[in-house]
Amino acid sequence: PTIVPEASYTPWSRTTLPENVTLLCWHNSSRIAVAVVVTLAFLVEIEQGNEVAVVHIPVRGELPARLGPSVKALPEYGPSIMDASVYRDPTRFELERERVLGRHWMLAGRSEQVQGSGDWITYEGHDECIVVVRQGDGSLSAFHNVCRHRGPAIVAEKTGCGARRFSCPYHGWVYDTKGKLVGIPEREDFGTDHVADIGAIPVAVGEWGGWIWINLAGPDKAVPLLESIGPDISNDLGAFKMEDMILHDVIEWDVPINYKAIIDGFNEIYHVTELHHSPPEFTKATRFASFHVTGDNFMCFVPRPVSLEELSSETYDHHRNSICHYVVFPNTVFNCNPEHIQVFQPIPLSVDRTKFLCWELIYPGDMNDPEYAAYHKKTMAHWEVLKGVVGEDISIYDQMTRTKKSSAFNEQILSEREFKIAMYHENMDRKIRD
């Protein structure tokens, strides 16, 4: 996101997208906030053309039905009231840092970012700094980017290639790519017991779906990654084969709001009619959505408007005919269209500040192939629209920033279709108590 000087923006601009789709944008002087006039339903109808054989087409196959007459749309939870202090209590945030963010799996990046031996990336958030390094045998190692001597970051750069060792820029302590301390200048001046067999503190690391996941609890205490994701999501989300996709774009926002407020927006679809100006067809489709609780995580499936008449079929394929939405506790959201995927990750920086990442994944192919070129053109058009939709979300975060400490904001009134918000925070409460 670019901070635009007040005198340097045009109030309205027009961009012509493929397929004669027109997108109107209004640029705010403090942040580019996009008002999408193109309706999602119209774009979805455009997408329903011939399937492109040159890319992977996710299909339900033998997986359980997630939409249709035999599927219960909502669990029995009901409306509720929720205390608003969860967004602004600094003591609670410190407990979340320790007992939630410090014990659960979180995304650190894409596997393709560290393809070669010695390639590394860093993860920074909630006062932690982690290095992830590809080893010569193809495995990954991860450790806290903190020198054991006096505490500065061992690795200054956020990413790099082909490292064999890392040297702390302060006093030159040297670590190998697994975080083992292998060199201390003037070692004889240190107490032997103080520097024997020490190294950077290790972090649990794993790969699934083409993503790198880390767990700050460490290799000995972290639950297995796939156990945390759970079989329902690993199988259902796995049908999209994210490991075969490529990273097209990453957008980052610095948002002055609690990270859980961002997750809340992905745990309901009640807002899409008003905030995203969704037309009646899409609003109708959201009423047929199904919501599923699976362990600590959630799944939601919204049928595309053009497929509503097929919902009566027991063989309805939600992968090909709906938007598939997965929330992996505590802060990872997968928004899957059949053609491409957006991954949202709000990383807390403090109790009321969040680094909000949006990753766009597409299927690879040859741009010289007319079929793939058509797929790419259509997908990029949709991505431009979705960036506008996220811009609308950002505009609401701005409004929430104005009122987050107001004496009038003490509780939230939640409908039964917002039950995932209540359950998410109940789950957070349990993790803190445990």
What are these regions (language model features)?
Residues P1-T2, S8-E19, C25-R31:
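Low-acidity, Ser/Thr- and Arg-rich intrinsically disordered low-complexity segments
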Residues Q113-G218, P224-D232:
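Rieske [2Fe-2S] iron-sulfur-binding domain
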Residues A53-K158, V203-G206:
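N-terminal pre-ligand scaffold of iron-sulfur
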Residues R134, S139, N145, A204-G206, ...:
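C-terminal catalytic domain of Rieske-type non-heme iron oxygenases
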Residues A108, I154, L181, F409, ...:
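Short clusters of hydrophobic/aromatic residues that line enzyme substrate/ligand-binding pockets
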Residues R103-Q113, I184-E188, H325-P330:
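Short Pro/Gly-enriched beta-strand edge/turn motifs at strand-loop
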Residues N28-S29, A33-A41, E45-I46, V54:
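Compositionally biased low-complexity segments, especially N-terminal hydrophobic helices
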